[in-house]
Amino acid sequence: LFIQDKYGSYFFNTPNDLYNGKIYRYRYGVANVDVPGDPNWAPRFGAGQVGFYAQDKWDVTDNFQLTYGLRMDIPLLFDKPVANKPFNDYARTKGWDVRTDQGLSSAPMWSPRVGFRWDINNDRRFILRGGVGLFTGRIPFVWLSNNFTGTGIQLSTYDTRSTSKLNLIYDPNGQKANAEKLKASGNQTLNVFDKKFRFSQTLRLNLGFDFNVLGINWTAEGIFSKTLNDIYYKNLAYEPTGQTLGQVDPSLSFDNRPMFKRVTTGQPYSYVYALYNTNKGYTINLSLKAEKHFDFGLDLSASYTWTKSMTINNGSSSVAQSNWNYNYTYRNSNDPELGNSAFNIPHILKAAAFY
């Protein structure tokens, strides 16, 4: 946990502006000392995850087995963020149905799964296997840590393009001099999450075939993963105007990116990052592997994997602002379309030799 822009963030239009100290934009995050009582304040909260798993194996015949199990995970958040009553009241009037002191649901996350293994000729030469189930990984509570820092109570964020009176201060601990020149008392960047928010869960199906042909052991496998719950962010402080950049600027008539307007004008809420769930997204993996073992001690193997992974938000940052700002979309940042995952590696080819 940290105070974003604590040491000041300066933006410049050109390298020459940087050289001349001509600031285009300035951002500064600071703890409101009269609230937490510490200029280096950081929130404290407790979280945990309880998991239970039961599994059984049934030998239906000599060459056909079923394995089935049930996992239950319970996410626990032992604290709540601080209530920002003015914002909570304002959010209610906007119909956002969010508040800064929202608690996390501790409803159990059930993950049943079943798998099979069929030794077709009962000689281990041709084996068909597969399964289907729901899966929940380790819960990334860092996504919720933003809500404890971004209540709008303990921190203020200065974000201005009115920089004529500001100086380029190289001392990271001397940024207060610029903050004191700003007329505003500091806008608030808030982080909230939907009261129905649940952590990520995936439906996964796999089918594999192990066989031996010409003395070579082969494995062909396919895995399909469908998103049931994943994350996506909205900036509630901005909404589309209904126009594109090309409509606003005729010289850019080819540009169909939507224009946005701030809907919190007159309020100190510059950015309101809200965390929601989505069921959009999937991953397909197809692989083929060959292995050859020689009696004189040489082992050879080669494999190829093709992957297609689609998502609407990679969740690659610990900061809500970054997860929203740097999520690629050509349409609407608050309603992103399905696109290639940042973690997608379409083609993987491996080869190995051991002696």
PLM features: residue spans?
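Short acidic-glycine motifs
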Residues: 1-355
